[in-house]
Amino acid sequence: MQINLNLKEKASSYKIYINELERLELKGKVGIVTNAKVAGLHLEKLLSVLKCDEKFIISVPDGEEYKNLTTIEQILEQLFVSKFDRSSTLIALGGGVISDMTGFAASIYERGISFINIPTTLLAQVDASVGGKTGVNNKFGKNLIGSFYQPKAVFCEINFLKTLPKREFAAGMAEALKMAITFDKEMFSWLKSVNLDDENLAKLVEKSINLKARVVEQDEKEKGLRAILNYGHTFAHVIENETNYKEFLHGEAVAIGMNMANRLSVRLGLMSEAQAEEIKQVLVKFDLPVSYKIENEYAFYEAFFMDKKTKGDKINFIIADKIGSAVIKNDVKKEDVLETLREFK
């Protein structure tokens, strides 16, 4: 199955392939960026189908805490030592962290070389690998250093998801639910009752990618519509930073963030209490956390100002006003936000 992502700059458009990895044929040097855990599960499969002139394995540490400039420098050093040039290609074999770092390294090596995403987690297949967001974290916050840089192609293998731990799978469901809650109430209703067997899992990936692709086509650089896909993330990024990226997986933090955003929406008179509870119960159904103990609501609030979506003294909150619809609010009173945060003390 193929999904086309058609961007205004036609040279940046690309295809997303589902269960068609055998199509992968490249020229020149190829660097496969992965980590030891993913390599042990999926590298053999990739090497068995990959057709190229010369291949190199670039192993990086596993974990969000290693998504930083130090790791990027390690990747770049291996590219220089191996004499990669502008005709070379990087392959991201892994989850969202691998995808983000590989894309960023590709975007800055010799001012840009090609890269291909082969996402191995549900979170990466339904979200992180599609759309061209790349980057790393630093002490000031998440993804504050990065670029928009589109892959040449994305290859999603549904069988790769069978090796995921239950917690990793749930984290991916948070991103799929995010898209359903903000853009597609029918998809949300489907997820409420679906049994995710192999067939429905493939449908979930297809539905999510189609949604993401259509949004990116309209707003590649996140000037408006695409920002809606940051629903839950304004809160999530603060949670991740406060816990040094060690307590929650990204999707888990997003699930908590969506619940927090919904509580704010209810307080503002946008979302009904019933729908906020309905969403919360679906998050719980997929084994996602919905609460986080906030020690200091004032410090939490101030951390919002390090978010990329903040403009000057205006915090852009992405808020679902009902299932299947969301708005961007930059006029939320500080006290309304603080009162919402106090619900989680």
Swiss-Prot record:
A single Gene Ontology CC term: cytoplasm
The UniProt record lists the keyword Signal: no
Keywords, sorted A to Z: Amino-acid biosynthesis, Aromatic amino acid biosynthesis, Cobalt, Cytoplasm, Lyase, Metal-binding, NAD, Nucleotide-binding, Zinc
InterPro entries linked: Dehydroquinate_synthase, DHQ_synth_AroB, DHQ_synth_fam, DHQS/DOIS_N, DHQS_C
Binding site for NAD(+): 62-67, 96-100, 120-121, 133, 142, 160-163
The reaction(s) this protein catalyses: 7-phospho-2-dehydro-3-deoxy-D-arabino-heptonate = 3-dehydroquinate + phosphate
Keyword Repeat recorded: no
NCBIfam families listed in its UniProt record: aroB
Family from the record: Belongs to the sugar phosphate cyclases superfamily. Dehydroquinate synthase family.
Name of the protein this chain belongs to: 3-dehydroquinate synthase
UniProt source species: Campylobacter concisus (strain 13826)
Gene giving rise to this polypeptide: aroB
